[in-house]
């Protein structure tokens, strides 16, 4: 199972934080910092992309009889330019399959954004999350075909654009003007003007 997907830059600024296992917010931040410390100190030329998890972060103190043990958790990452794409998985997942999944994720983002960069992920976070949701849901991999992933995300983007254009048409009508005036507190002024 995939427990978390983290994307952060070389300054430990998160660009995506998605947990599929319940983890308290303070522990999420601590986990991100510890994963960053572990990864940033590694020499990617001589060391693998596989790590063991920081101690006791995925287990809450109240939930000691949870089936997840830290010895079963791995951190698998890949560095692209200024970003680290990191998956936190249990030992049931193949390390090489997760590395391939990271590659699929990045290729899908490249196709959606045409040469993805960090700013694309910041300003188009909805597309970033949509791509991830097409690949992983509930901690399980559901799609690995880049063409299908991109087609699904394109459909979502087209649906969002058509919804936005319908909202734009609504605001140009009298009803839309009424809603806009009412929201701004000038409903009486609008009503007398009609």
Curated annotation (Swiss-Prot):
Intracellular or extracellular location(s): Golgi apparatus; Cytoplasmic vesicle membrane
Classification via Pfam families: Clat_adaptor_s
Assigned keywords, A-Z: Cytoplasmic vesicle, Golgi apparatus, Membrane, Protein transport, Transport
GO biological process: one example: Golgi to vacuole transport
Membrane topology: Peripheral membrane protein
Family (UniProt): Belongs to the adaptor complexes small subunit family.
Misc note: Present with 1240 molecules/cell in log phase SD medium.
Protein name: AP-3 complex subunit sigma
Protein's organism: Saccharomyces cerevisiae (strain ATCC 204508 / S288c)
Lineage of the organism: Eukaryota, Fungi, Dikarya, Ascomycota, Saccharomycotina
